Amino acid sequence: MDEEGFCYRIYRKETAMKEYETMHLVKMEDLNHHQTLFAARAAAWLVEAGFVAAGCACESSEGIVCRNLQNMSFTKPVQKGTLLRFLARVVYTGKSSFMVMVRAVDALQDTLYIEGMITFVTIDGETRKKREHHLTLDAPQDEQEQMQREAARRLLDMNKR
């Protein structure tokens, strides 16, 4: 880390890009008029989980900003009382940006409820201009991680059109 707290961690080829976990209990105040999880609350939790993964990957949250949330989708309604486990992993790296895939699953039954992709950008604390993060991806550890990386690349390709 430099004097501004900016991340300069470089991952070796054999280092796995870790999956980070956060949890939320769906309470009454998290519900919409259908008595299921309000989409805006779910989006906030998704971005929060992505930011946790981003900060952990960079070993600091300084200089990391959310650029956008993409392809957030619900596979089924989330009911009050559900224990949601958010699993987040860096799946794409550019020079100053990187993407984090986040999945929200039922902590007790492992049922997938929500997934989405978040793009983060690293910036200089003083100038607020983009700054390289120096993160690199290792080889995927399993088929699921490979599929997540391919989804990120497809999303990038779609956005370039």
Language-model regions, residue ranges each:
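HotDog/MaoC-like acyl-thioester-processing domains
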Residues: A16, Q79-K80, V91-R161
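Short amphipathic
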Residues: A16-M28
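Hydrophobic residues in beta-strands and at strand termini
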Residues: V26-M28, F74, F120-T122
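A conserved, well-ordered hydrophobic junction motif at loop->secondary-structure transitions
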Residues: D30-W45
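Hydrophobic beta-strand-centered segment that forms part of the acyl-chain substrate-binding groove
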Residues: L37, F51-L87, V91-F98, T111-M117
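Short, residue-level hotspots on alpha-helical faces of the histone-fold
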Residues: A44-E48, V52
